[in-house]
Amino acid sequence: MSTEPKCPFHHTAGSGTSNKDWWPNQINLNILHRHSSLSDPMDKDFNYAEAFKQLDLAAVKRDLHALMTTSQDWWPADFGHYGGLFIRMAWHSAGTYRIADGRGGAGGGQQRFAPLNSWPDNANLDKARRLLWPIKQKYGRNISWADLLILTGNVALESMGFKTFGYAGGRPDTWEPDDVYWGSEKIWLELSGGPNSRYSGNRELENPLAAVQMGLIYVNPEGPDGNPDPVAAARDIRETFARMAMNDEETVALIAGGHTFGKTHGAGPASSVGPEPEAAALEQQGLGWQSTFGTGKGKDAITSGLEVTWTSTPTKWSNDFFKHLFSYEWELTKSPAGAHQWVAKDAEAVIPDAFDPSKKHRPTMLTTDLALRFDPEYEKISRRFYEHPDQFADAFARAWFKLTHRDMGPRSRYLGPDVPAEELLWQDPVPAVDHPLIDEADIAALKAKVLASGLSVSQLVSTAWASASTFRGSDKRGGANGARIRLAPQKDWEVNRPAELAAVLETLEGVRKAFNDAQTGGKRVSLADLIVLAGAAGVEQAAKNAGVAVTVPFAPGRTDASQEQTDVHAMAVLEPVADGFRNYLKRKFKTPAEALLVDKAQLLTLTAPEMTVLVGGMRVLGTNVGDPKHGVFTERPGTLTNDFFVNLLDMRTEWKPASADNDVFEGRDRATGELKWTGTRVDLVFGSHSQLRALAEVYGSADAQQKFVHDFVAAWNKVMNLDRFDLV
């Protein structure tokens, strides 16, 4: 018998087999409770925007300029300048952004956390962040990691002679990883033919993904699945960059501009490289990819496995990238690490060595670089940029600014003296308020007019929800401000029931015009404000019908955007393909409807209780799109009761599938078999899922009516104001 002592802490909290291991298909409510105050070390009254305003940004930039050329022995700078490394760091911080759901991007400084800190494509960026630590330490809470990573990329460009378009701070840090779907693969860089491939059919990339392989930011620089075919690579580039909100011109500018600087690293075999940061030994203190090849750094560094320097001036802005791209013919070769790359035929050695000034190399390129020459559309743009360097510089400056600010939302969130004055269409601009706002007396009068207009509670609530619920907490886009629900493309979305929406908006516009025409002091109400106010009036009336007097908070200040201020193509990605709050599915998806509800709730920054109370309220207010009966578990539609929960939890009702795919269910009286209700997966999950049932029981209790109404109003008000950054 063994006498070895047993560890008394073998069963520590969080260890062992998890619920997810036992029931992998169970919906994940944890995504609704990320980034709470429980994980935030800052004081409760800490306001990052105010802290950033106290920052001496010029001093930070001076320190960053000095850092660029202060090479450290533990990680030496290529060519004596860290610019290329820091550009890559900033690019990869922002480059995870994808337009399909707005997730990823530079906001929050997620590059510090798993899995991003350990993606193969982010190899050795841990060193870049450690180089920055003395500056972050010096300025502390006045600049977030999220802002510092992007600022450093900007300063890197400026220190090498490039004039940037501008810079905005305003990205508060997060303190734990986002819960983002990055793909189903279980192996880093798994090829497209793998068992969990993100591709189907004719290389159709799964939504909402944008990168071509697990662990890459964009595309495989060697070509699709490592196949060195520049034309095939162009297809991947175009698809991936489009999914990251970039058109062809922006794509060419970004690739060529970024590859004007620095180099890649592939001095030796990948077998010499140790584990990534999350798998590295404790004593490495969060650093990964420790290499045993030579010195493991400097001339011996291994990152991507590619060994390419694009220009003869890797620490200075130039047009060399295009000069080399078009001046040479290219032959396929391999890096010292064995990766596919290209070298200029019959070329002189004009490229400096990163560490030995006596050495020169022939120009080299990546497969994805050559795509800019051999794809017909990219070639036209590349040649124009080659012939017109000023156009190239302007395009790169604008594309870099877009890349690094795309997930920040409206300009009202931009902070600092370097914010550019120019308003850009992709920022979803709205006009500034240029008139007196309505007061409490006006608000009461407008509510009365709306309620007397003939519009139903359902119409008022549905329209306000449709307007506000486009908001995405991921990239801060959408929301009620701008009243874009009256513009293309939103006015034509199926989920908004265009014909009924047009009639509602026409009525509300009549109320708005009558009010504005009656004013003598310039006071006006915008349609954006009136839509939200009308929704508040509907909720108050529905609560009154239930015997509960309540006032829905309302803060005027929204304005109406024009069609010219609206990028129809960019706005189209906000169209809901699923909105469980309205019991809407555009089509059948592999992902269950209840999981899509949770995903929508997470984009709306809702907690599980807020999601629960909103669904229960929306059902009894009759806001369904499609079948008006599913989930409307009440005999009093239009009345804000807790009937949804009471009737869902009633054990006298037996539920059975009513469709072959188990998407619709019938609830029948257990004793008589009489049909009482019909519901969807979204409805029934509140009785099936143990956590959601616990919440439903709170609102389904006999003493819950008052609490239900007040909680609904609070959650409703939150959604209506998600885009009101001016109120924060």
Swiss-Prot record:
Where does this protein have coiled-coil stretches? none
Mention any one GO cellular component term assigned to this protein in its UniProt record.
cytosol
Cofactors needed by this protein, per the record, are: heme b
Q: Where is this cross-link: Tryptophyl-tyrosyl-methioninium (Trp-Tyr) (with M-244)?
A: 91-218
Q: Where is this cross-link: Tryptophyl-tyrosyl-methioninium (Tyr-Met) (with W-91)?
A: 218-244
Q: Which UniProt keywords apply?
A: Heme, Hydrogen peroxide, Iron, Metal-binding, Oxidoreductase, Peroxidase
What modifications follow translation?
Formation of the three residue Trp-Tyr-Met cross-link is important for the catalase, but not the peroxidase activity of the enzyme.
Q: Which GO terms describe its molecular function?
A: catalase activity; heme binding; metal ion binding
What reaction does this catalyse?
Answer: H2O2 + AH2 = A + 2 H2O; 2 H2O2 = O2 + 2 H2O
The domain of life is Bacteria
Provide the residue positions that the database annotates as binding heme b.
259
Asked if the Swiss-Prot or TrEMBL record annotates the protein with the keyword Heme, the reply is: yes
Show the active-site residues.
92 (proton acceptor)
> Which EC number applies?
1.11.1.21
Instruction: Tell me how the cofactor is bound.
Output: Binds 1 heme b (iron(II)-protoporphyrin IX) group per dimer.
Relate the protein's function as given in its record. Bifunctional enzyme with both catalase and broad-spectrum peroxidase activity.
Q: How does it assemble?
A: Homodimer or homotetramer.
List the protein's name. Answer: Catalase-peroxidase
The source organism is Burkholderia multivorans (strain ATCC 17616 / 249)
Q: Please name the gene that encodes this protein.
A: katG
